[in-house]
């Protein structure tokens, strides 16, 4: 990845609210299925905005820090997804998204961020990201002191 896109907590909350607005009315949904781990925080934000209490997870491992590797389903929510929102933080190459579509063909699959290769696999997203860009999510970062340039 040649570029980085840094996401702050504030940005994430703003984008999640935009996505939640598009998912109204809330009473059309039975619940939310979060794709672990990237979709966990966005699912909490959507659940709050939409007043949804039924939140489940599908646990798929497809990244090893910044490298994609073999995909493995560790846990899945029951059913075909009918009446459920499935959320992940982003759709990248589409590998995870294809697995989600196979598991939950009737779900409404959304992400906050979408890269060109994966975009056709989601029903909705908020932000376009170039394919060669790595997204730094706020839960992966910490605040660090940076000394002044003058050294004083």
UniProtKB/Swiss-Prot annotation:
Give Gene Ontology CC terms.
cytosol; plasma membrane
List the EC numbers from the record: 2.4.2.-, 2.4.2.22
Q: Where does xanthine bind?
A: 92, 135
> Where, per UniProt, does this protein localize?
Cell inner membrane
| Pathway entry | Purine metabolism; GMP biosynthesis via salvage pathway; GMP from guanine: step 1/1; Purine metabolism; XMP biosynthesis via salvage pathway; XMP from xanthine: step 1/1
Annotated residues that bind guanine are located at 92, 135
**Which of this chain's residues are annotated to bind 5-phospho-alpha-D-ribose 1-diphosphate?**
37-38, 69, 88-96
Any Pfam family: Pribosyltran
- Could you tell me what reaction this enzyme catalyses? GMP + diphosphate = guanine + 5-phospho-alpha-D-ribose 1-diphosphate; XMP + diphosphate = xanthine + 5-phospho-alpha-D-ribose 1-diphosphate; IMP + diphosphate = hypoxanthine + 5-phospho-alpha-D-ribose 1-diphosphate
What's a Gene Ontology MF term here?
magnesium ion binding
Note the topology in the membrane: Peripheral membrane protein
Keyword set, alphabetical order: Cell inner membrane, Cell membrane, Glycosyltransferase, Magnesium, Membrane, Metal-binding, Purine salvage, Transferase
Question: Alphabetically, which GO biological process terms does the record hold?
Answer: GMP salvage; IMP salvage; purine ribonucleoside salvage; XMP salvage
Q: Does the keyword Repeat apply?
A: no
Does the keyword Oxidoreductase feature in the UniProt annotation? no
The domain of life is Bacteria
**Gene3D superfamilies with a match to the protein in the record:** 3.40.50.2020
Q: Where does Mg(2+) bind?
A: 89
- Could you tell me which InterPro entries the record lists for this protein? PRibTrfase_dom, PRTase-like, Xanthine_Guanine_PRibTrfase
Quote the record's binding site residues for GMP.
69, 92-96, 134-135
Tell me the cofactors it needs. Answer: Mg(2+)
Q: How does it assemble?
A: Homotetramer.
Entries under NCBIfam families matching the protein: PRK09177.1 (NF006613)
Role this protein plays: Purine salvage pathway enzyme that catalyzes the transfer of the ribosyl-5-phosphate group from 5-phospho-alpha-D-ribose 1-diphosphate (PRPP) to the N9 position of the 6-oxopurines guanine and xanthine to form the corresponding ribonucleotides GMP (guanosine 5'-monophosphate) and XMP (xanthosine 5'-monophosphate), with the release of PPi. To a lesser extent, also acts on hypoxanthine.
State the family it belongs to: Belongs to the purine/pyrimidine phosphoribosyltransferase family. XGPT subfamily.
Output this protein's name. Answer: Xanthine-guanine phosphoribosyltransferase
Question: Where is the organism placed in the taxonomic lineage, from the top?
Answer: Bacteria, Pseudomonadati, Pseudomonadota, Gammaproteobacteria, Enterobacterales
Instruction: Name the gene that codes for it.
Output: gpt
């Amino acid at each position: 990845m040649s570029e980085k896109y840094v996401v702050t907590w504030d940005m994430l909350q703003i984008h999640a609210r935009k996505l939640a607005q598009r998912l109204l009315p809330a009473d059309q949904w039975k619940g939310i299925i979060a794709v672990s781990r990237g979709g966990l925080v966005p699912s909490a934000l959507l659940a709050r905005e939409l007043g949804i209490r039924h939140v489940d997870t599908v646990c798929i491992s497809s990244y090893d820090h910044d490298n994609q590797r073999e995909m493995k389903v560790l846990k899945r929510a029951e059913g075909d997804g009918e009446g459920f929102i499935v959320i992940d933080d982003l759709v990248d190459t589409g590998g995870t998204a294809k697995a989600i579509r196979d598991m939950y063909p009737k779900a409404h699959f959304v992400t906050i961020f979408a890269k060109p290769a994966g975009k056709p696999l989601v029903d909705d997203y908020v932000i376009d990201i170039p394919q060669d860009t790595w997204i730094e999510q706020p839960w992966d970062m910490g605040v660090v002191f940076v000394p002044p340039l003058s050294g004083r």
